[in-house]
């Protein structure tokens, strides 16, 4: 019998490459349903559903986000996982990395008998003001 820790680890190890590959393409977003709860929330209600998150993922069609895990931790008792990630904004046409930054992300998980889903996401971005400014420009994020 697999431990809950190992199940969460396997789930998270599958999640990051799936996000990078499928979440930002309307044709493949549905593949992410296996990772996200329908009532997914981000950062204190900035996103309040899986569908709203999918819409947000499509707002930068010329840029592909690529996530690389640098460190992953799991707290099976609290049903949480956290990751130190390197994220790259990659120009889809040229493959050029337009921006690279670090972020810490905390994931609250819903754990059922047969599946695990991400229920809440909290993102803490690198504090470099130049990178934050470029991020806002690339993704047309209002100040």
Task: Please report, for each region that a protein language model flagged, where it lies by residue.
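Basic/polar N-terminal segments that are highly enriched at the extreme N-terminus
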Residues: 1-3, 142-143
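Short acidic-aromatic low-complexity motifs
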Residues: 2-35
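Hydrophobic alpha-helical core bundles mediating ligand binding, dimerization, or RNAP-core interactions
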Residues: 12-19, 36, 57, 83-87, ...
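Residues in soluble alpha-helical coiled-coils and helical-bundle/repeat scaffolds
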Residues: 20-23, 41, 112
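A solvent-exposed, acidic/Ser-Thr-rich amphipathic alpha-helical stretch
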Residues: 26-81
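A beta-strand edge to alpha-helix "cap/lid" segment located at domain peripheries
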Residues: 60-143
